[in-house]
């Protein structure tokens, strides 16, 4: 389901790039790949691309918490601010990585995603 979601978001992003800037990315390209291709096309430095992508990802997760826990706008903004140093740290660490370093596993996230997929009422796909 996460792969499907990433492709659907990628297709939406790809459509905006094509419609607004006439920049074409192949259909069914995953969102992170679309972001990387767009950053290269628009000459956005890698470090800014990483920071922007991670900040956007964290903000989206926190926005879900604001709406559904609810934690409120103030606490949500505080959470976003608290991510800045970690995002910078991740960006700095990534400067020395290569393709062989890519990978990851999130057992708890995967288990809860599987449980979430089987709920009758769902707010989001994953």
Regions found by a protein language model. Give the residues of each.
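Amphipathic alpha-helical interface segments
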Residues: 1-68, 78-81
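C-terminal auxiliary extensions adjacent to catalytic cores
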Residues: 56-126
């Amino acid at each position: 389901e996460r792969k499907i979601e990433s492709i659907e978001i990628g297709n939406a992003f790809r459509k905006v790039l094509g419609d607004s800037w006439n920049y074409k990315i192949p259909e069914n390209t995953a969102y992170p790949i679309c972001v990387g291709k767009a950053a290269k096309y628009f000459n956005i430095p890698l470090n800014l691309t990483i920071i922007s992508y991670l900040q956007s990802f964290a903000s989206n997760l926190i926005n879900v918490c604001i709406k559904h826990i609810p934690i409120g706008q103030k606490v949500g903004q505080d959470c976003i601010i608290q991510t800045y140093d970690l995002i910078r740290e991740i960006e700095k660490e990534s400067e020395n990585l290569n393709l062989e370093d890519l990978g990851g596993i999130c057992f708890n996230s995967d288990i809860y995603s599987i449980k979430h997929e089987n709920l009758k009422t769902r707010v989001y796909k994953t």
